[in-house]
């Protein structure tokens, strides 16, 4: 990590670097013992012990999450920083020393690294507690990966952001060059709706399709027709993606199935666009059902809303990143992206700033998030700590 001159309030560079070996070991311990959403009891206990040893009084929030205040009741604004705790229901394929000991559970999105970063921030803030000009609230959030609607929504409902002026979160991203920060005002990530489509026809023998109403044929037509929802429904402006990702029907080779099922997603960056897409999608489904004489049922699981940055918060992140890493390392390229994030609920409740820290190693095909070979790059730990601390200094200087 390269720092530029201009660090104010405190200059934690040496302290950060000295802390990295301990945080690396801690991160790999979390990686070795992954836990799914709302099951992060071991991770929660680890974070609680770390925080209590440094003078915090963490309180449980959202079952397996924690909220910890640096200076409860201090005058001035409260700045919140968030890390997600949970793993993915995936198998670890790597042979790294700290690979997962739990089959079907693995940290393949880097939340172990995010947690280590925020614990490092907690350490540095605690060392300088008396000179921090306000309260910093640390959010250790469970269940970002979509279990029961996500942990961020629960944390908001349980008051984790009460009295908070602004909230910030980061995510490692192997798709961006290592050492870059990607951030913008407005939409960062998409609203995501999950679709389940059930087609009911009339089954029968494969030799007599004329006596059947084949849900597989109707479904094949529907998959193709749905690709026109955006291209012909929204035109060149687009702004949405409709993807059918699962299609199942039948049990054997000589029977026309009674039912077929499809699953997929609708993603967009504006609520109004999502509404138009869903209207057109229902029209296409109704037309397909009528054309093929089948019944088609649509279930929609409304997922996370658009993750949108407040202009003031996005500017603060960009300003701090430019100061610490250089202006050439700050970019809006490839944003917004069509993934979803429950940080959206935090940024709906109070002004928020969400940003990506690149981890793509030069000359390497770095595994992306959710790939079975992914592992968090520990060299991002000091970068993340420095950025979070810089944001805290910047926000107190402006808002204080």
What are these regions (language model features)?
Residues 6-107, 112, 116-133, 137:
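Acidic/His- and Gly-rich active-site-bordering loop/insert found
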Residues 217-400:
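Metal-dependent amide/peptide-bond hydrolase catalytic core
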Residues 8, 15, 19-26, 39-50, ...:
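General structural feature for long, well-ordered alpha-helical segments within catalytic domains
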Residues 88-90, 94-106, 112-113, 128-257, ...:
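Histidine/acidic-residue-rich, glycine-tolerant segments that coordinate divalent metal ions
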Residues 80-82, 91, 195-197, 354-360:
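Non-cysteine beta-strand/loop elements that form the S-adenosyl-L-methionine
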Residues 30, 68, 81, 111, ...:
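Divalent metal-coordination and catalytic microenvironments
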């Amino acid at each position: 990590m390269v720092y530029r001159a201009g660090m104010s309030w405190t200059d934690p560079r040496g302290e950060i670097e000295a802390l990295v070996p301990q945080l690396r070991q801690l991160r790999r311990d979390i990686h070795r013992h992954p836990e799914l959403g709302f099951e992060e009891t071991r991770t929660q206990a680890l974070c609680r012990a770390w925080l209590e040893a440094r003078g915090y009084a963490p309180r449980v929030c959202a079952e397996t999450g924690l909220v910890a205040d640096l200076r409860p009741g201090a005058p001035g604004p409260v700045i919140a920083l968030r890390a997600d705790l949970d793993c993915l229901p995936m198998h670890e394929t790597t042979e790294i020393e700290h690979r997962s000991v739990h089959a079907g559970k693995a940290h393949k999105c880097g939340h172990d690294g995010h947690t280590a970063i925020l614990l490092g921030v907690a350490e540095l803030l605690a060392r300088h507690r008396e000179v921090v000009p306000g309260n910093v609230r640390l959010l250790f959030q469970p269940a970002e990966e979509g279990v029961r609607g996500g942990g961020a929504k629960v944390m908001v409902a349980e008051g984790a952001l009460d009295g908070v002026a602004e909230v910030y979160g980061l995510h490692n991203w192997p798709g961006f060059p290592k050492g870059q920060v990607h951030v913008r005002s407005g939409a960062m990530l998409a609203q995501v709706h999950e679709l389940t489509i059930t087609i009911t026809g009339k089954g029968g023998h494969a030799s007599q399709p004329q006596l059947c109403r084949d849900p597989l044929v109707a479904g094949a037509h529907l998959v193709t027709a749905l690709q026109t929802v955006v291209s012909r429904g929204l035109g060149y402006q687009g702004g949405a993606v409709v993807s059918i990702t699962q299609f199942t029907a039948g049990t054997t080779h000589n029977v026309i199935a009674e039912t077929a099922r499809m699953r997929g997603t609708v993603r967009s960056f504006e609520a109004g666009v999502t509404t138009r897409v869903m209207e057109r999608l229902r029209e296409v489904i109704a037309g397909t059902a009528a054309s093929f004489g089948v019944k088609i049922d649509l279930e929609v699981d409304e997922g996370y809303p658009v993750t949108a940055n407040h202009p003031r918060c996005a500017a603060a992140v960009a300003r701090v990143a430019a100061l610490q890493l250089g202006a050439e390392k700050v970019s809006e390229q490839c944003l917004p992206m069509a993934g979803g994030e429950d940080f959206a609920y935090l940024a709906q409740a109070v002004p928020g700033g969400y940003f990506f820290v690149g981890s793509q190693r030069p000359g390497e095909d770095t595994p992306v998030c959710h790939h079975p070979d992914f592992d968090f790059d520990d060299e991002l730990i000091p970068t993340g700590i420095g950025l979070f601390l810089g944001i805290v200094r910047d926000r107190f200087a402006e808002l204080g």
